[in-house]
């Protein structure tokens, strides 16, 4: 990962948040990844580690920047399992789960297999409407919008896993969404 980051120009900001396969606890919210995981790049000015979920403001458009709600999406599996309409096609259309969670204003609205950290505040509540919601747990690419919110599900760079084969899910690897912050239009690049 560090070798990959080294190839990215310094004027491009990198925001890294943990997911369910990373070296951190599974219960959410997940703390940001520790310094010792990235010994060479941890002090780079363009490398930022955040918790999961996290809302960040990026690039001061109209002096305030766009609010990006970043959430890996570990609760998606449990949520899909409990709602028939989502169960039928959510793995092929991951934006449907994300939009459903935006409607509910909660990232883990169903109690079940998703592990939540017992904290005084529910960090999974979507308190402020984001401008952009970004996720990636399903390893499938999707771009949509819901009531003015750009909904982006990142694919991964990993081929189909054994688990995905068992459940009949074909990931969509190597797709990256580029969002124009001024007009909110998206472009997809295949790598």
Which residue stretches match the model-derived regions?
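Extended recognition/assembly regions associated with phosphoester-bond processing machinery
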Residues: 1-191
């Amino acid at each position: 990962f560090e070798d990959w980051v080294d190839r990215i120009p310094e004027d491009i900001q990198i925001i890294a948040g943990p997911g369910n396969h990373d070296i951190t606890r599974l219960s959410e919210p997940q703390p940001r990844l520790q310094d010792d995981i990235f010994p060479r790049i941890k002090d780079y000015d363009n490398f930022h580690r955040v918790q999961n979920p996290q809302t960040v403001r990026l690039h001061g458009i109209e002096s305030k920047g766009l609010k990006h709600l970043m959430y890996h999406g570990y609760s998606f599996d449990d949520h899909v399992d409990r709602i028939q309409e989502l169960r039928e096609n959510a793995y092929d259309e991951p934006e449907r789960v994300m939009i459903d969670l935006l409607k509910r204003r909660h990232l883990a609205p169903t109690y079940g297999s998703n592990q939540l950290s017992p904290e005084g505040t529910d960090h999974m509540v979507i308190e402020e409407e984001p401008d952009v919601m970004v996720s990636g747990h399903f390893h499938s690419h999707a771009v949509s919008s819901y009531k003015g919110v750009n909904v982006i599900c990142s694919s991964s760079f990993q081929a189909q896993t054994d688990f995905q084969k068992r459940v009949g899910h074909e990931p969509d690897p190597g797709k990256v969404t580029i969002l124009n912050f001024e007009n909110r239009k998206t472009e997809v690049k295949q790598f």
